[in-house]
Amino acid sequence: MATELDKIFLILEIAEFIIGMLGNVFIGLVNCSEGIKNQKVFSADFILTCLAISTIGQLFVILFDSFLVGLASHLYTTYRLGKPVIMLWHMTNHLTTWLATCLSIFYFFKIAHFPHSLFLWLRWRMNGMIVMLLILSLFLLIFDSLVLEIFIDISLNIIDKSNLTLYLDESKTLYDKLSILKTLLSLTSFIPFSLSLTSLLFFFLSLVRHTRNLKLSSLGSRDSSTEAHRRAMKMVMSFLFLFIVHFFSLQVANWIFFMLWNNKYIKFAMLALNAFPSCHSFILILGNSKLRQTAVRLLWHLRNYTKTPNALPL
């Protein structure tokens, strides 16, 4: 029987699911229609579309996971059900995070400017570098999946206290192994965060340098390049903020689930954890001029449609 807390948790999770679906479906439809119309797919649109598709898959996994935790939490600790759900969530989360990181790096090389030869060399080979990052993310996904599988197997043994002999004799050893595996998982999650943070820092340096050059040339501090810098910085900063909340919520959720299994507290951690796939799409829409203009036109048409009287004149 669902409690009041379970009902509130499910309502909030459904709201996050709807919000995330609206934003990501919109991004996917706009980019696909533009690609069909222009008979050409740009790199940024391709990454955005892949990110939207990956996030949509993650949102469905999150919704199923939420109903499982909210209505049948006792089934979560079973090997046959808990393990595949956690593995599937981890795969979609890994892809979403790395695609968002690649998008941040792409915008950095597209907008920022440094006269250094290394930057110009990387910028010239930007598409190939993005492909290499995605290949690296796939290798890390395989490594993470193997580590996570061992992590889940040990954790479910600890949670299953019916095996008292194993629990009393080997619990300390198992917890030590869990700590090592958890550190490995955290390190691989830190790689995309550090790449995005580096992009943001260089964005800031590029903006400062560009603004100083404009002031020295008496052109003011507002031009198209400056505005592009600022929009991209806001987008990357918003992504990093959500990613930090997402990362720490994931660590807290893992600790609560595998160490305490407190059904009440893990719901709050999941709500914070799932804010990233739900809200990130709207940051992308606001930061992309094409998506932003399309969204404004759509809202304008919807507003006019709602104002149209339904009654037909006699």
UniProtKB/Swiss-Prot annotation:
It comes from the Eukaryota. This is Taste receptor type 2 member 42. GO terms for cellular component: plasma membrane. Keywords: G-protein coupled receptor, Glycoprotein, Membrane, Receptor, Sensory transduction, Taste, Transducer, Transmembrane, Transmembrane helix. The keyword Transmembrane helix applies. Most taste cells may be activated by a limited number of bitter compounds; individual taste cells can discriminate among bitter stimuli. The gene is TAS2R42. It is a multi-pass membrane protein.
